Amino acid sequence: MKNIAHIILDGNLTSDPEIKTLNSGKSVATFTLAVNHDYKSTLEEPGEVSFVEIELWDRQAVNAHEYLKKGKKATVIGELRQDRWKAQDGSNRSKLKVVGQMIRFDGLPGKKEREVA
């Protein structure tokens, strides 16, 4: 049986998306999404925030680079992936990221929302 690692995130960009075009001609964009959690231990205490790296490919990458900016709200549906590599000191390293399969851009000027599949 195949395992499922899908995730839905709704948050705000911490910076403008960075885009690269690979030798293969494919485009990849990356940005970090700040996702606020609703729970707080006290009214004075700020809520917890998670910072999640998002990776988009091809047309989604180009659209994100064109339409999304720091502070803008976005909803990402994607797959949770783990990058693994060996550091210069020989230690094994890893990090989690979300590879977006669908993204919704909220709050675009002149539009209520835009969905890119």
From Swiss-Prot:
| Listed SUPFAM superfamilies | Nucleic acid-binding proteins (SSF50249)
What is the superkingdom listed in this entry's lineage? Bacteria
The biological processes this protein is annotated with in GO are: DNA replication
- Transmembrane segments in this chain: where? none
Q: Does the keyword Membrane apply?
A: no
Question: What keywords are assigned to this protein?
Answer: DNA-binding
Coiled-coil ranges from the UniProt annotation: none
Pfam families, A to Z: SSB
The protein's GO terms of the molecular function aspect are: enzyme activator activity; single-stranded DNA binding
Could you state one GO cellular component term attached to this entry?
A: nucleoid
| Annotated SSB domain residues | 1-107
Q: State the PANTHER family in the record.
A: SINGLE-STRANDED DNA-BINDING PROTEIN
Q: Fill in the subunit field for this protein.
A: Homotetramer.
Q: Under what name is this protein listed?
A: Single-stranded DNA-binding protein
Can you name the source organism?
A: Leptospira interrogans serogroup Icterohaemorrhagiae serovar Lai (strain 56601)
Question: Lineage, please?
Answer: Bacteria, Pseudomonadati, Spirochaetota, Spirochaetia, Leptospirales
